[in-house]
Design a protein with these regions (language model features):
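Conserved GNAT-fold acetyl-CoA-binding loop/helix
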Residues: 38-60, 71
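Generic hydrophobic, aliphatic-rich segments that mediate packing or membrane embedding
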Residues: 69-71, 85
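A generic membrane alpha-helix/interface feature
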Residues: 53-56, 62, 149, 172
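Acyl-donor (CoA/ACP) binding surface of acyl/acetyltransferases
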Residues: 1-28, 33-36, 76-188
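Short loop/turn motifs at secondary-structure junctions and domain boundaries
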Residues: 63-68
Length: 188
């Protein structure tokens, strides 16, 4: 799909991971980490209990990814030969050159640099588009792994959405931290 910033969404290739287009052949890989309870620690909904729930989620992101203002990639581990997460751009505003970054990574790969490599690929790709200017993301304030990763990359904390998240499992509200990165923040 071609956008008005002169590019189309493409697969991105790193050292240990590739960001590949959505492909239902990897639904079992997605299901494998979607049934791990700790994966949902920083998500508002409960652990998937069946392959059908995973397929429903996959179909939902496929449907969104067909829109001009959204795209998801699957995070594919070259060494493990499997999908270990997803990363995407939402609410892409091609006129302003902005987008929201979203992501989810298998807990089996937390703290090992896979998210940082995925983040780098998406940021580099996005900021190489003409007219691109800013990326932003929301994360649980208590998600220190995510907060540290995006801060170390250069994202700046812009603010807090108080009690933004509502956990369906516990009915507990938590703050969301808002981070942003401008093209001008990237050191050449």
């Amino acid at each position: 799909m071609v956008n008005n910033m002169g590019s189309q969404f493409e697969e991105l290739f790193g050292d240990r991971i590739n960001l590949i287009n959505l492909n239902s052949n990897y639904i079992n890989d997605i299901h494998e980490y979607s049934i791990i309870p700790i994966f949902y620690k920083y998500l508002e909904y409960d652990c998937f209990k069946s392959i059908d729930e995973t397929k429903l989620f996959f179909n939902k992101i496929c449907s969104k990814s067909n829109d001009i203002d959204c795209h998801y990639w699957m995070i594919y581990s070259v060494e493990k030969d499997k999908v270990i997460g997803t990363i995407g751009l939402h609410d892409i505003d091609w006129r302003k050159g902005s987008a929201e970054l979203t992501y989810g990574l298998s807990p089996n790969f937390w703290g090992k640099g896979f998210f940082s490599e995925s983040l780098n690929l998406v940021v580099e790709w996005f900021f190489n588009l003409k007219n691109s200017n800013s990326l932003f993301l929301k994360t649980y304030g208590s998600n220190t792994g995510s907060v540290n990763s995006v801060s170390n990359y250069g994202f700046k904390k812009e603010g807090v959405l108080r009690e933004f998240y509502l956990d369906e499992k516990t009915n507990v509200r938590q703050d969301a931290f808002i981070f942003s990165l401008l093209k001008s923040d990237i050191k050449k």
